[in-house]
Amino acid sequence: MGVTGAHGFPCCGKGSVEVAEMRDDLSQHQIQEEQELEADMLEQKPQLQVDLDLDPDPDPDPELEIGQVPALLESELYPALKLEAELDTEANSNEESDFEEPMQLVCKIESVHSNMGLPTPQTFRPWSLNSNCRSFTEENHVSACHHSISAQTSKHLFWANKLIQASEHSLQRAINMQLNNGSAGQPIRSPLREAIPTNALCSEEQLQIPDAHSAPPTTSSQAPSPLLSSDLPPPIDLTELITFASSLAMASSSRMDLPSLEHMMKAPPQEALEPSTEPLLTTVEEREPENHAETLPEKPREARAPLKSWSQEDKNFAQSYFDFSKPGIKRATIKGQIQLLQPPATSPLLQGSKEDSVPPGKEKENPLLVKIHFKLSAPTIPEK
């Protein structure tokens, strides 16, 4: 058996014993601190109860009391943890503030640059006005440089009813529209010059002997019966009138120069030209206008229309341009005048039109311009 006591243990030294005693002292010190904290807690509980009794709220919230007590315990038991938590929150807040400040600066700088790049209204409006004015002046300049001028040769122009002007192309369109609407008649050929070479001799014979036949073949052989005002046939329209003028002009100007045509159209005595009481097909009067006395050749005073002495072949030729079988044409009286106009050869417009209209390999001829004025009258009702 060994020696007992402090010096009886050979493996343990004095230092180890002292350390054990120090540990005991530390544990006792901690126990004392915990007891003091419990005593403080017991002292604070009566104070909380007194405060709750003084509170006018009849329904105190028990969760608030439970939440306050652990918070106090943690703050008092672990003051170092509280300090570290506060330092961490401050560091985080500082980092967030440091991060937000550069972002704000960047945003401010970008907004300033973007605003500086935009044009102000004072500089934008004059630019738009200048651009609009420039485009308007350019359009005016273009429109002033480009003009469309409609020109037609004298062979294609005919006048009817004074101020109304038409050509063979517009006449053909009007006639086609009339035929499509249901009017009776044979189809009309568009170029009026197609029938000129085949019917030139016929027109010459008609002009030389205007009184070869006493009555036209298209007139009715029966005497006209008494007609009331409501039974009168409708008068011919402007399209038919222009077509009739075109047929008469083309028949009278076929393969003949102006002097020979005037010589052939000289009239017989005045008595033969007086209209009878019966309805006539046509009566054409020719006279020289005063305003064309210098430029126009000498015109015969009066002449009968060559349509009155046409044969069956001439009737077919006329029907290709004008339907003489209509009752309104048979019973109507057409009065008018024909003016043969010879334009000067030095006219630049007519010279250009001649060069365009004459095909290569043929001689150039002076165009013939015929101006025809007509006046229609309804058939007269014979007296009983």
From Swiss-Prot:
The keyword Metal-binding does not apply. One of its GO terms (molecular function) is actin binding. Keywords: Phosphoprotein. It comes from Homo sapiens (Human). Residues 23-60, 211-232, 284-310, 340-366 are annotated as: Disordered. One of its GO terms (cellular component) is perinuclear region of cytoplasm. The modification Phosphoserine is found at S167, S170. Interacts with syntaxin-1 and ACTB. Detected in testis, and on the acrosomal cap of spermatids. Residues 214-231 have a biased composition (Low complexity). This is Spermatogenesis-associated protein 32. Residues 353-366 have a biased composition (Basic and acidic residues). GO terms for biological process: spermatogenesis.
